[in-house]
Regions:
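Short pre-active-site segment immediately N-terminal to redox-active cysteine/selenocysteine motifs
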Residues: 27, 35-41, 46, 77-80, ...
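Post-cleavage N-terminal segment of exported redox proteins
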Residues: 1-27, 73, 100-104
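Axial heme c-ligation environment in periplasmic c-type cytochrome domains
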Residues: 50-58, 73-104
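Gly/Gly-Pro-rich "capping" loops immediately C-terminal to redox-active cysteine motifs
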Residues: 28-32, 44-73
Length: 104
């Protein structure tokens, strides 16, 4: 009986330990999808802008701002960037930002 309890406890512990990584991977996949659909048109698939006015994400300087500042920028728009309020939800924007931070 004790060995069965130990096995169940071990299984639950391993399951709990792996859950955040799985969630993170799914968030990055969602972020990649959102980024490729909405952001890459100007910021490029690899974070190097395809239009001169778009900031580079390859250097990461623009992405060092706090998440909520960047979410507001995306929602409200900036200079030539259109607003995405009503188009993207906050969690989609965050996923795209987290994905953009992985670009090199």
């Amino acid at each position: 009986m004790k060995s069965r309890i130990a096995r169940v406890a071990l299984f639950l512990g391993l399951l709990a330990a792996s859950a955040p990584q799985t969630v993170l991977a799914l968030d990055l996949l969602r972020g990649q999808r959102v980024y490729n659909m909405h952001c890459s048109v100007c910021h490029g698939l690899n974070g190097v802008p395809v239009i001169q006015q778009a900031p580079s994400f390859a250097t990461k300087e623009r992405l060092m701002q706090p998440d909520m500042v960047l979410v507001q920028s995306v929602k409200m728009g900036k200079t030539i960037m259109p607003p995405f309020m009503g188009i993207l939800k906050d969690d989609e924007i965050l996923d795209a930002l987290h994905y953009a931070r992985t670009l090199r």
